[in-house]
Structures are given as structure tokens and as C-alpha cells.
Amino acid sequence: MNTIQRRAVMVLATGLLASAAFAQTAPVKVGSKIDTEGKLLGNVIALALEANGIKVENKSALGNTKIMRSAIIVGEIDIYPEYTGNGAFIFGEETNVAWKNAKAGYERVKTLDLAKNKIVWLEPSPANNTWTIAVRKDIATANKLKTLEDLGKWVSGGGQFKLAASAEFVERSDALPAFQTAYGFKLKPEQILTLAGGDTATTIRAAAEKTSGVNAAMAYGTDGPVAALGLVIMEDTKSVQPIYAPAPIVREEVLAKNPKIKTILEPIFKALDGATLQALNAKIQIEGQDAKKVAGDFLKSKGLIK
């Protein structure tokens, strides 16, 4: 081998070593949605990975579902917490009954996302953070409203109703439109206060404080402040909503480079049942604690990080 060949080999070897080093040190980009629980779970993931020696870039509170999906598909983020029931909307399968069953919904979205987008769904939490509507307790009591069927009849009969919600909840076919179809009511534009961001902390507070005449709010099944702020969740007796179990989803190539992500996160999400998420969300929404602090305190209390 002559001098020129040796130099070429050395340059190539140096380049390969540099590429390998970059692959090993490139941070895992952790994202999350902009709502309270999104911020909480995004920080849970970021802190847990970091505590176990995985370098991360925390990009929590990035945006809504559409933004997060686009970001993970193009590689702007590598991992974020998503909900199994959103598979119905993401893959245009709103009529598939699988989404109403926790196990079937998880298996369906896991299969679809891996095949179509090379995105891996890790094991979900046992919680169900389904979309719902919460009404001020004084209104619910006075009008005997316990279910969405009761609410639909009351609204259709001329009940004074105004809902605070995100644009996503109002526009998505599997959210407010699905409730209206199933329970036989139709809100006029003036009966909806659309709030930017999509955080249920904002919609619930708007109902509690009667902002612009609002007396009901878009809420999630694991929202902490619903009862504390004097609202009552309307029961979805027709099971309109899918099961929304939170789970970490990660780009396949990133998981291949960092396989311990799976073993780190699965016991953590298993510990995040509905009651636990409600309590953690309440610390953020009612007590005003920082989402990162709440996430860290939870992980430490469970002995999941030091």
C-alpha cells in the first residue's frame, strides 16, 4: 500500500469513527404536546432517559397532535407521549370498533404506525385520558345533568349552554362532532369559546370563572382540577370516545440505537394509572407547580430515578 492509499484509508477511518461517535452522542429529541398532561409526560420521559445515561434534548410543549405527528415523522423529534385512541384519527379509522377496547386499540395503532411510519409504540399506561365534556356543578345539579345524553336533550331543548374548548376538539370528527351526532345536539358558533393552545387547564378555568358566559369545558378523563373547580364530568354512556391510553412512541431507528429506552420507560408508564395522573395533573393545574418538577418528584418518589 503506497503513501496516498494509506492516507486515504486513514481519512476514511477517521470519518467512520467520527460518524460512529456522532451516532452515539446525538441527543434523543423528546417532544410533547402543549397541554398539561403532555408537558408532564414529556418531562417524565426526558428526565427518565437522562437519569439512565441517555443524552436528551427536551422539546416539550411543542404543539398539538398534528404538529407532533409531523415532527416525529420528519425526525424533528424522536420520541413523545401519544394516546392510543388518536390512532382512529391519525389513520382515518374512526369507525373501527378496536379503538373502544384498550388492548385491541393499542395493538392496532402499534401495527399501523410501525408499518407505515417506522414508529414504535411502547407499552401504554393503564389510564384512559379520554376526551369528555365537564359542566359547572350548579348547572348540572339544577338541570339534573349526569350524562352526555342528559346534556344533549337539555341543549336541544334550549338550555343556556356555552362550551370552552380547543380548536382541535371543535374541529376533529372524533371529538365534539362525534358527541353531537351521538347525543343529538348541535352547538351554534356563539355557544363555543375556542381557546388557543388546547390546554384543558384553560378551558376548565374558563368554565369555573364563567368567562364570556362559559358554563362547560372540554376536559380529559385524567384532569385534576375538574372537581376541585366545581365542574362535573358528563358520562359518555354510548362510548363515543375511543380509549386514550398514553404511551411513549419512538422512531424505530432511534430505538435501535438506544434499545434501553424500552426497558426504562415501560415500568414508569405502568405506574401512571388514572388516579396517579389526576393527582400529578392537579399539582400543575391547581397548585401551579412546574411540570418538570412534578415529573421529577414522581420519578424519585417511585424510586425510578435518584
What are these regions (language model features)?
Residues 84-177, 181-185, 189-198, 209, ...:
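Contiguous mixed-secondary-structure segments that line small-molecule binding/active-site clefts
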Residues 47-48, 66-77, 93, 182, ...:
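Short helices/loops that flank or line small-molecule/ion binding pockets
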Residues 36, 58-70, 167, 188-205:
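Short helix-initiation/N-cap motifs at beta->coil->alpha
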Residues 19-23:
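Sec/Tat signal peptide C-region and signal peptidase I cleavage site
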Residues 39-44, 54-83:
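Extracytoplasmic small-molecule ligand-binding "clamshell" domains
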Residues 27-45, 61-64, 168-171:
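Extracytoplasmic "Venus flytrap"
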Residues 36-55, 177, 181-183:
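Short, polar/charged alpha-helical segment
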